[in-house]
């Protein structure tokens, strides 16, 4: 069986007009998939150069397949029918590593046709890294790398106003475009780059904030042999995603024409303010995911679909959404309920979305996706929302890394992995009790951005829930909340 490459699988190749920081599954099944559709159905005619922003050789480079790969988009469509659509993506031309091909990276700025920059460098990617310098080859942080590339562009074209870029970050942080722009300006000032460059940044470039929404299930490990047999070729970069997607971009109205959205209908909205869309999605879709994962996994389930077909776990999630999340959100209730109904429908997607793959960086996800609603509920009602509080206890229990005597991988930053290993070891040895363990976790101001032990009743309630999970098991402990 042949492996994908452009010699054996000839077809359209597009001039390079898009730089993409990030080679991961999400961008490939979201941005590159949409660009591919626009290339086919309009005269967008734009190829993507993927820049690998971190120093790693895993996964291998997309260039090993000449940028080609297959997306398999599947799930329930708008009519509730199960669909599956395989598409050979030709929008990506090549991948370069900013670490091993730094000169090639800078040369991207010399191409007059370059117009767009997309990125997904994870929720931690748009951040300041002290000590990044102009001469670093490369700097460590993504914003510093981008600043250097923009300066290369500015210098090469002598500050021409028609050579600026439209920069569209897809990282899951609030107002990601504004945050990225502020960091680029910070590096420009820190590196004492000329005032003319700072003016050019402002006048010639657009930093657009976005909301991205698609569940991307990635490489379908369990089904690869069957899928490759159906496709007739080997593809080391197979990428699976759900049918539903939404891309909301806060940017100039002219963007719709530039991206040819007026010529082919995609679920892309160009808006003046993404805030309401963001709050709805992060609180309901991401919040429900984050509440569901530690509860369902420790109840013995492995995928989102299994969890939604389990009467008790499904009831827990739906009650969390309708009784504890929606009431504290600032949008019309009917609009929120209709979005929530679409979300739970998407969760019933018959294709496997592994709970463990969503569990990545669970501590940060809880802080950004659930904590605001938990605190708002407590403030509004004077009582803690029972299910969101239970989800926090379940999350702490999840970091034991053991289910029914078997270990499972827990992925989070090193600080939390070490912290939990130490705390659970002390708990097992009866050095600390459950309430003390919970208090230590909730007192981590650097993480929570506040001292959660000061929230009335929170330590006690989380400790009670955690004791119930440890003594009775997840099924018994969660039952009263279903």
From Swiss-Prot:
Gene Ontology molecular function: any one: tagaturonate reductase activity
Keywords: NAD, Oxidoreductase
Pathway this chain belongs to: Carbohydrate metabolism; pentose and glucuronate interconversion
EC code(s) of this entry: 1.1.1.58
Alphabetized Pfam families for the sequence: Mannitol_dh, Mannitol_dh_C
Entry keyword Ribonucleoprotein: no
Extent of the signal sequence: none
One of the GO biological process terms: mannitol catabolic process
InterPro entries xref list: 6-PGluconate_DH-like_C_sf (IPR008927), 6PGD_dom2 (IPR013328), Altronate_OxRdtase (IPR023668), Mannitol_DH_C (IPR013118), Mannitol_DH_N (IPR013131), NAD(P)-bd_dom_sf (IPR036291)
Annotated GO CC locations: cytosol
Catalysed reaction, written as an equation: D-altronate + NAD(+) = keto-D-tagaturonate + NADH + H(+)
Protein residues bound to NAD(+): 18-29
Entry's family note: Belongs to the mannitol dehydrogenase family. UxaB subfamily.
Protein name: Altronate oxidoreductase
The gene coding this protein: uxaB
């Amino acid at each position: 069986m042949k492996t994908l490459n452009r010699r054996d699988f000839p077809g359209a190749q597009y001039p390079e007009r898009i730089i993409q920081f990030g080679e991961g599954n999400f961008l490939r099944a979201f941005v590159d998939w949409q660009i591919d559709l626009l290339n086919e159905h309009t005269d967008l005619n734009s190829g993507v150069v993927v820049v690998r922003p971190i120093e790693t050789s895993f996964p291998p480079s997309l260039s090993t397949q000449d940028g080609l790969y297959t997306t398999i988009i599947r799930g329930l469509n708008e009519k509730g029918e199960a669909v599956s659509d395989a598409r050979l993506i030709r929008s990506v031309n090549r991948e370069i590593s900013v670490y091993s091909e730094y000169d090639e990276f800078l040369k991207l700025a010399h191409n007059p046709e370059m117009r767009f920059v997309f990125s997904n460098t994870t929720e931690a990617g748009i951040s300041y890294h002290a000590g990044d310098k102009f001469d670093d080859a490369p700097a460590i942080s993504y914003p510093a790398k981008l600043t250097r590339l923009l300066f290369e562009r500015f210098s090469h074209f002598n500050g021409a106003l028609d050579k600026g870029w439209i920069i569209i970050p897809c990282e899951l942080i609030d107002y990601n475009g504004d945050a990225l722009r502020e960091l680029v300006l910070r590096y420009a000032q820190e590196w004492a780059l000329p005032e003319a460059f700072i003016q050019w940044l402002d006048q010639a470039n657009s930093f657009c904030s976005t909301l991205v929404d698609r569940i991307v299930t990635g490489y379908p490990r369990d089904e690869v042999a069957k899928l490759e047999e159906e496709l007739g070729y080997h593809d080391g970069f197979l990428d699976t995603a759900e049918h539903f997607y939404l891309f909301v971009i806060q940017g100039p109205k002219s963007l719709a024409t530039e991206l040819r959205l007026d010529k082919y209908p995609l679920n892309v909205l160009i808006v003046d303010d993404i805030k309401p869309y963001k709050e709805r999605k992060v609180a309901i879709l991401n919040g429900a995911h984050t509440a569901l994962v530690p509860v369902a996994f420790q109840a013995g389930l492995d995928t989102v679909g299994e969890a939604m077909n389990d009467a008790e776990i499904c009831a827990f999630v739906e009650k969390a959404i309708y009784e504890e999340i929606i009431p504290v959100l600032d949008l019309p209730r009917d609009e929120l309920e209709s979005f929530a109904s679409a979300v739970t429908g998407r969760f019933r997607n018959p294709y496997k979305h592994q709970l463990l793959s969503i569990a990545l960086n669970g501590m940060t996800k809880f802080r950004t996706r659930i904590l605001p609603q938990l605190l708002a509920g407590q403030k509004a009602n004077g009582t803690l929302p029972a299910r969101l509080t239970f989800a926090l206890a379940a999350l702490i229990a999840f970091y034991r890394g053991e289910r029914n005597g078997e270990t499972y991988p827990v992925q989070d930053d090193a600080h939390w992995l070490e912290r939990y290993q130490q705390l659970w070891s002390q708990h097992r040895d009866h050095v600390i009790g459950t309430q003390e363990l919970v208090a230590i976790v909730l007192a981590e101001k650097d993480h929570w951005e506040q001292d959660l032990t000061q929230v009335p009743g929170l330590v006690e309630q989380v400790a009670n829930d955690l004791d119930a999970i440890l003594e009775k098991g997840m099924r018994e402990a969660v039952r009263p909340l279903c």
